[in-house]
Amino acid sequence: MQEFYARVWNTKEMNLLKSLAAVSSMTMFSRVLGFARDAIVARIFGAGMATDAFFVAFKLPNLLRRIFAEGAFSQAFVPILAEYKSKQGEEATRIFVAYVSGLLTLALAVVTVAGMLAAPWVIMVTAPGFADTADKFALTTQLLRITFPYILLISLASLVGAILNTWNRFSIPAFAPTFLNISMIGFALFAAPYFNPPVLALAWAVTVGGVLQLVYQLPYLKKIGMLVLPRINFRDTGAMRVVKQMGPAILGVSVSQISLIINTIFASFLASGSVSWMYYADRLMEFPSGVLGVALGTILLPSLSKSFASGNHDEYCRLMDWGLRLCFLLALPSAVALGILAKPLTVSLFQYGKFTAFDAAMTQRALIAYSVGLIGLIVVKVLAPGFYSRQDIKTPVKIAIVTLIMTQLMNLAFIGPLKHAGLSLSIGLAACLNASLLYWQLRKQNIFTPQPGWMWFLMRLIISVLVMAAVLFGVLHIMPEWSQGSMLWRLLRLMAVVIAGIAAYFAALAVLGFKVKEFVRRTA
């Protein structure tokens, strides 16, 4: 085992674990700040016509951001950028970046202007019920026109971030999303009284947040010599390759968003509160899946792309294997702990005021169901870049479509007996299916060969997770009822339980001969 990891780190690659820690910590900070933002917005604006209008107005730019900026573009752009960096030289890479940024700016400027002009019709499609209330409809239209430029700004910020990631500057793009939260918190606390109606402050905060995310990264882009003026050339082969890859990439990312929308439609037919219970459970799920899964995918895509571009298949396999082992090392205990601690988590974080014990219990059910698929959600973030880095987007797209169909079949099977928890379970099981099919294709196409030692590695993990689970159940047994005490007291108790579980897990690993330094070996 030690020889294997020595080979991994005796390369010219940077210490990926250090990069993972940096990206994960930045993502964690952004998620925590996001929770604070939600709490502040809820406290200042409450829940009513104005906030309904804002969330609808923000939903479309946010959806397009998820589809375009954070998923499809990176999948299409990063592997080709890595190829240019590896084979074409700095000047050719600068020209390539200029042409891609020019086409991106042109396309998104058209989309932004069209969206602002067509705002009333967009609202008619996305929130037809608002048309019955003239004031609400007018406010939503106004808010949408203010927030729509965010699509252009965040997409350009994502372009800059993708370039920085390819140059191994991972922490800078990872920190950028915090500026949106900071902007919204600042505008909500200090600027809202100066707007009429006050909710307009939130819309402007979104656009300002987009500007900050872009501007923050530009000095770092200049440092690596890639700050260029956008240029338009419809005949450049490199830029056109990115455009051609964008089609299937957008389809692939859209499939997951479509699945979430369909699940919301299913939930809307269930008891009142079902959508909210799933939302809060999903927010808890996003911590491990976002912090670990997104961070791993972020650092692996450019690293794998470089290995593929240089023709180093052995290094490519070692990187994939390293990512998968780290995935299982952290995701397996996270999934088990999330299921065991579902009640303490939901009660400690949410059961206050109008959020009743019944609401917490229903959220708990959804969270347990989600936890079944946590490892699948995270493993997909490691396996999918294995295809994207080879400029093969079609295979993951085909698998995503199969997964979407299976998700809906499972929804129909589970929604009757399990209600909203059945919908959560469908998402979790579908993620595991997605991961399994991706792995099968990687092996079938002889893209990835696992390194030796997996059986003993998994045995140690399973034994350690069982020890952790026993400790968690033991500590929970002696804890008083979680609904007792203030929020601070509940969170302190929850923290103590989590620390006990973490200590038990890594202590068991140490007894079984596992050494964390196997993952952190560096070049000299």
From Swiss-Prot:
Known pathway? Cell wall biogenesis; peptidoglycan biosynthesis
Q: Where in the cell is it found?
A: Cell inner membrane
CDD domains found in the cross-reference section: MATE_MurJ_like
| Protein origin, superkingdom | Bacteria
This protein's membrane topology, according to the annotation, is: Multi-pass membrane protein
Q: Has UniProt tagged this entry with the keyword Lipid metabolism? A: no
Point out the signal peptide segment: none
* Stretches of the chain forming a coiled coil according to its record: none
For this entry, list what GO says about its biological process. Answer: cell wall organization; lipid translocation; lipid-linked peptidoglycan transport; peptidoglycan biosynthetic process; regulation of cell shape
Mark the transmembrane ranges. 44-64, 103-123, 146-166, 172-192, 195-215, 250-270, 284-304, 322-342, 367-387, 396-416, 420-440, 456-476, 494-514
One example of the protein's molecular function in GO is: lipid-linked peptidoglycan transporter activity
Keywords noted in UniProt: Cell inner membrane, Cell membrane, Cell shape, Cell wall biogenesis/degradation, Membrane, Peptidoglycan synthesis, Transmembrane, Transmembrane helix, Transport
Q: Name one Pfam family in it.
A: MurJ
GO CC list: plasma membrane
Do the record's keywords include Transmembrane? yes
This chain's function reads: Involved in peptidoglycan biosynthesis. Transports lipid-linked peptidoglycan precursors from the inner to the outer leaflet of the cytoplasmic membrane.
Similarity comment text for this entry: Belongs to the MurJ/MviN family.
Q: What is this protein called?
A: Probable lipid II flippase MurJ
Q: What is the lineage of its organism?
A: Bacteria, Pseudomonadati, Pseudomonadota, Gammaproteobacteria, Enterobacterales
